[in-house]
Amino acid sequence: MEYPTESPKPKITRKTVIFPIIGLAAFFLYIYIFQVDMLSIIAKAQTADPVLYALAVAFSLIEVFFFSVSWRVLAKFLMIKMSVMKSYLLVWYSVFVDTLVPAESVSGEALRVYMITREQGKETCGRAVASLVTHRILGMVMNVVVLILGMVLFFTGTQIDPLIFNLVLLLSIGITVTLLLLILFSFKEKWSLKVINWVVRAGNFLSRGRWHRKLIKIKEDAINIAKSFHDSMKEFKNNPQPLVFSLFYLAVMWGFSLSVPYLVFLSLGQQVSWSVILITATIVLAVKSIPIGIFEVGIPEITMTALYTVLLEPTLGPEAAAGISITATILTRLITLWLRFGIGFAAQQWLELKTVIAPADNVPVEKA
C-alpha cells in the first residue's frame, strides 16, 4: 500500500465562505442593535500606539511558538521525529485549517495527525493522536487554572456580575467533567475496541455486507492505531517528565497570549485589570474548544465585546465601556484571527511546496 503524497488541502466551498460571512453579519448586527457609534470606534482605533500594537503582534507570534514547542515535547517523547521549526509550521498550518473548516477545535489536530502519518508512516498515527490528546488535556488543565485565577483576582478588586460568575462556574465544571472523561477514555483500551466494533457492525448493517472487506481492513487499522494510542498514554503515565515540561511551555504560552489583548488596551490608552483579560480569554477559548461547529468569525467578537463591556462597566460606565470594548476587540482579532490566518496560509503553501519538490524516495511506502 502506498501512502498518498498529496494532503487533503482545505478547499474553498460554499460553507467555508458563508459561515464567516454569517459570523461577521452577526457581529455588525450586534453593533447596530446596541447603537454603537462606528465613526468614533474608527477614530479611536487610529489613535492606537503603533509601538505597543506592534509588540502585541510580536507576542502573538511568540505565543504560537511556545504552543508548538509544548506539543513537540510530547511528540518527541513518543519518538515522533520533528524539528522545532517543523512543529511551528505544522501548528500554523493547523491554525489556517481551524479558521477555514467548521468544528475548528479538532480539524487542525486531525490535519497534524495526517501530516505526521504521511511523512513518517502509518505506524506513527496512534502516537501522533496520543501526543495531541495529551496536549489537549494539559491545555484544559491550564484553562481551568487561568479561569479560577481570573475570578480570584476580580473578586479582590470589585464585585463581580452574577451572570459572569455563573458562566465561569458553569464552564469550570464543564471543562473539568470533560477533562476527567477524556482522561478516563484515554486509559480504557476496551472502550476503544468496543467503539470500533460497533462502528464496523453499523457499517456492515447499513451497507448490507457490500463493504465487508473494506470494513475488515479499516477495523484492523483502527485496532492497531488504538493499541498504539493507549500504549503511548501508558508511557506518559509511567514517565510524567515530558508532561511537566509541556505544561511549563503552555504556561509561558498563556503569558504571551494574555499579553496580546492587554497590550491592545494599553495601545488605546486604557489601563485594564488582568482579571478582565483572564476571564474573557478563558471563556472565549473554552467555548471555542468545544467541537460543535463554527466559532471563529463573528461569535468570538460578540462574546469578547459583551464580556469586556460587562466587566469594564463598573469603572468606565456603560457608554465608554462599550466603545473601548468594541475597539479593542476589533484590533485584537486583527492579530489573533486575520494575521494568523494569513501566516497559516503561507505555512500551508510552504509545507505543500516542500512535499511536491521532495525526492520521491523520501515518501514512506508500505508494501501490500
Residue ranges and their predicted role:
Residues 281-293, 332-336:
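Transmembrane helix-bundle signature of multi-pass secondary active exporters and lipid flippases
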